[in-house]
A protein has these predicted regions:
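Soluble "head" domains of membrane/secretory-pathway proteins
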Residues: 1-124
């Protein structure tokens, strides 16, 4: 679905499909342009406020800061860039490997998930 990308409607928790290093990847948005992101002691912080976010709480990721991410020049996500994480900790083909994800590399957001069947979901 390209509507959210085209009209800058991508939000936290959205799963996006993007191109990086000649491959297509799927990851979840945890940080948007203008925000500061950090994971400390298994908790996600956005703009220095702790976020009740299930994507950081039970993860193997202990600490990560925006300034430590590849292609990041500071503590704030620049315009047109996103920070993403995969739902599986073992798959590090997300911002931990590629750094900031440029909007021009985003193909769209995932609006239908059908496998595994018990996690069937859709968005409109």
């Amino acid at each position: 679905n390209k509507i959210k990308v085209t009209f800058d409607l991508l939000d936290h928790g959205d799963i996006i499909m993007y191109r990086q290093d000649g491959r297509v990847h799927f990851s979840r948005i945890i940080g948007k342009p203008g925000e500061s992101i950090e994971i400390r002691n298994h908790h996600l912080y956005r703009d220095d406020r702790r976020v009740n976010d299930k994507y950081a709480k039970h993860r193997q990721i202990n600490n990560i800061a925006l300034r430590d991410i590849k292609n990041s020049d500071g503590d704030t996500i620049p315009p047109g860039s996103y920070v993403v994480l995969n739902d599986k900790d073992s798959d590090k083909s997300d911002s931990r490997r590629y750094g900031l994800i440029d909007k021009k590399n985003i193909i769209g957001d995932v609006s239908l998930k059908y496998y595994p069947f018990k996690e069937f979901a859709y968005q409109f």
